[in-house]
Amino acid sequence: MARYEKQEKKDFVRKNEQIRVPQVRLIDSDGTMLGVKSVTEALYLAKQQELDLVEISPTAEPPVCKILDYSKYLYEQGKKLKDAKKKTAKTAMKELRIKSRIASHDLEVKIKHIEDFLKRKDMVRLVVVFHGRENQHRDLGEQMLHDVAKRLEPIANVEGGLQVTGNRMSMIFVPKN
């Protein structure tokens, strides 16, 4: 453990007696606006309902506070964060390499792997590698990539077309939505 670790700043939410402004814009537990009230009056209303006074928007003028159950509020905030993380796309780039003289059955197996990756919403780069004299027959590799693209057309789009770099020829497949 490092001696001087930076501590993460958690989103600090002021509640009850931690609110130090003279007046707040108050929202009731059912969401109705009660208007601008003094902090002591807002605290009294919260205690009457056996709930907490939580500062929702500290930058507003006057700050917006809501009467609610603080532990339930924290739970809902955590749930919102988890949902937001789930919605962010986690697409990975998978790469499959094949030789230009691959056997037809081996190519079928590779296509099955590509289909599995695409079903998991991953992007796939299919690379044809040329060795030695195979460089003279690049048209075979190009034809193979186009055949694979036609075969995967119902479930994938080709991104960027055919790319050639050195002794490699590649095509990127992106899953259809």
From Swiss-Prot:
Transmembrane segments: none annotated. Belongs to the IF-3 family. Its main location: cytoplasm. This is Translation initiation factor IF-3. Monomer. It holds the Pfam family IF3_C. GO terms for molecular function: ribosome binding; translation initiation factor activity. GO terms for cellular component: cytoplasm. Keywords: Cytoplasm, Initiation factor, Protein biosynthesis. GO terms for biological process: ribosome disassembly. The keyword Cell wall biogenesis/degradation does not apply. The gene is infC.
